[in-house]
Amino acid sequence: MDEVAVDLKQALPNVYNNLQVHVDVHQKSNSPATSQDIQSHVMQLLNRHCVVFGDYSWTEFDDSFLMKNIHSISIADTELKLKDRQPIDLSKCKVLIHIFQLNEDGPCVESLEEENEDLVAANHWLLPAADFHGLWDSLIYDSEIKSRLLDYIETAMLFSDKNVDSNLISWNRVVLLHGPPGTGKTSLCKALAQKLTIRLSYRYRYGQLVEINSHSLFSKWFSESGKLVTKMFQKIHELINDKEALVFVLIDEVESLTAARKASRAGTEPSDAIRVVNAVLTQIDHIKRYPNVVILSTSNLTEKIDVAFTDRADIKQYIGPPSPAAIFKIYLSCIEELMKCQIIYPKQQLLTLRDLEIIGFLENNISKLSLQLNEISRKSEGLSGRVLRKLPFLAHALYLQSPTVTIERFLWALSLAVDEQFQERKNFSENI
């Protein structure tokens, strides 16, 4: 332990310890290094940095072995437990190191043949995938949504490993995320699959994510749809039979299944439709018995989800629009990225919302820009996360058009872009 760490530890009496700290180690794709060697060098690095503040990443290393073999080392998700960035004494924590390499291939398309026509039934990724790298950190929520989902899946895996009798204690490994469009439900499902593949790499060699296109499962000839469902799940069964794989089945817009079921009951769709939906539910019931499968689902229309499906979900999590506090964090992450890329220049340190709370939102030369960002965040309330992440681009495209801008000019443009977004909404609703 170096002298700086000792001094810091003494100066901060409320250092957290006895935590479970996850360290994600991104190994380069061409690295031949063994996990044992990597773990040894990572522990040496962590021992030199005994006290850290919340989540932290290293991308440059003094150690030539790490420079040659590792992209990044990240202390991850501590703030999910501590809420705010806090000093953590790593020497008194249980440190779990997760080493992973990203699959660069992108998604494969799973097709089903119907009437001599190929239908895109699903997209299929090998995890961890480069497509989803960084996605987990980009998703910002007010409540403990991410922590709750991680804890749920890890508990489900524990119960399966310990052979808990599911007739006595019931769990299905089925998650339903519901809420308005644009709130990141599908992205959260993909990010969760990626994160869990990394977290559980000690027992599963890799992950598989199958994103089912719900609409493709319903043929225009309903009598054929049952065959499509069977074919789709036969392919999923092949993946599940590989015990070294952790398989995630993502059913997006699950209300499209239940809508067909209700329409059939009302007599507006053929009775074959209800058999198709029942076939899907039966297949879900069958694959959930396997310990290495997790079923993730999303819905934009909560009121249209059939009780037959919701009863199968262990967690029914509402994902709503972000609050001003979450919006502030989203904007702050965007600004930090633009500073890193030197589109916003010179780089300036902005205070976090927690910092502003500590000083009572007092305006001075240090807090002025952060307070301005806070005001922009407040007037952005009601916009979805999808829209919020577009606004920095629109601010630059519509009001700046310069290779480099100051933070002051950028905040001015961002404020105008927010106003423009609400005006567009108003104009659109008036013309409907």
From Swiss-Prot:
GO terms for biological process: double-strand break repair; oogenesis; reciprocal meiotic recombination; spermatogenesis; synaptonemal complex assembly. It comes from the Eukaryota. ATP binds at G179, P180, P181, G182, T183, G184, K185, T186. GO terms for molecular function: ATP binding; ATP hydrolysis activity. The keyword Nucleotide-binding applies. Keywords: ATP-binding, Differentiation, Meiosis, Nucleotide-binding, Oogenesis, Spermatogenesis. Plays a key role in chromosome recombination and chromosome structure development during meiosis. Required at early steps in meiotic recombination that leads to non-crossovers pathways. Also needed for efficient completion of homologous synapsis by influencing crossover distribution along the chromosomes affecting both crossovers and non-crossovers pathways. Belongs to the AAA ATPase family. PCH2 subfamily. This is Pachytene checkpoint protein 2 homolog. It comes from Xenopus tropicalis.
